[in-house]
Amino acid sequence: MKYIVSIDIGGTTFNSGIFTDSLNQVAISKKDKIRFYKSKNDVVDAIVKQVNDLIDSVNISKTDILGLGVGAPGPLDPKKGIILDTPNLKIFKNYHITYDLTKKLRIDTFIDNDANLFALGEWLLSYKKNDIVLGVTLGTGLGFGLIINNQIFTGGNGMAMEYGLSPFEWGIAEKNACIEFIRNKSEDLYGERLSPVKVEEFYHNGDEKAKIIYNEFGKNLGKVLSHVINMIDPQIISIGGGLSKAFDCFSKSMISEIKLYSPSYNVNQIIIARSKLRELSTMVGACQMVKNIKE
């Protein structure tokens, strides 16, 4: 039996997983925080240690590992294995991460946008009967991944679906639909920067300020999604990432906004749902990426 290692690098955390080549989960590490480390090299060394410890914990040989797949925030260059100038992971600006991980771990390493891999994992695990599936990740940033006819849509240069970096009202799209938006709005209304979890707690306790925050968040996300729906007309939109836990707080205003601007949503049965698997989908997508390249 062969195995595949996956690494999910977010804007603030990273963790690793081991799967069989048939995509069955073997082991998942705990999340580690990027802010605990001072430099790029320190983070990479921590990732290497996390992966080696996980491999040792399940007692498998590296000769039985097919490869390692990394999901990281874009924009990046998957063919060269380079993380480019991503606003949510500045410590890795223009960094050839696959070269260093391959060298340090002695495992062939490949990378793609984490939202692409999330979308691929969602398609594989939940929506394989559908031809066009959009994955949306809500967290430190706002990521999009698109599956068309069983494959990740990468565009002509490998950098498609970076819609989160597009102009949107005051700033760029992702700044109006990410964790930073929740923190900024809570500072405006409460006088302090609250975590999304705390605002969600207030929301469920009937707090009006929390309702205002998530209502506006949902409207912003709905406008962004309406643009994407009008361009690609997906059958499925699966929403993941840390903020997807608050889906019931913002979904109503999100859908209302989509109905205003997206004819296809009103005419067709486009499914918009919270991912049941979240980070697991990204890891499975990373494993499938390795299989596609190596097999």
Each language-model region and where it sits:
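ATP-binding/phosphotransfer module of carbohydrate and carboxylate kinases, centering on a glycine-rich
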Residues: 1-66, 77-80, 99, 103-107, ...
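A short acidic/small-residue loop/turn micro-motif
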Residues: 33-35, 91-92, 159-162
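A cytosolic small-molecule/anion-sensing beta-strand core signal
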Residues: 72, 79, 148-149
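A charged helix-plus-loop insertion that forms the helical arch/lid used to bind
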Residues: 81-91
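General beta-strand structural signal in soluble alpha/beta enzymes
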Residues: 109-114
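Anionic-ligand binding patches
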Residues: 118-120
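Glycine-rich phosphate-binding loop of actin/hexokinase-like ATP-binding domains
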Residues: 127-179
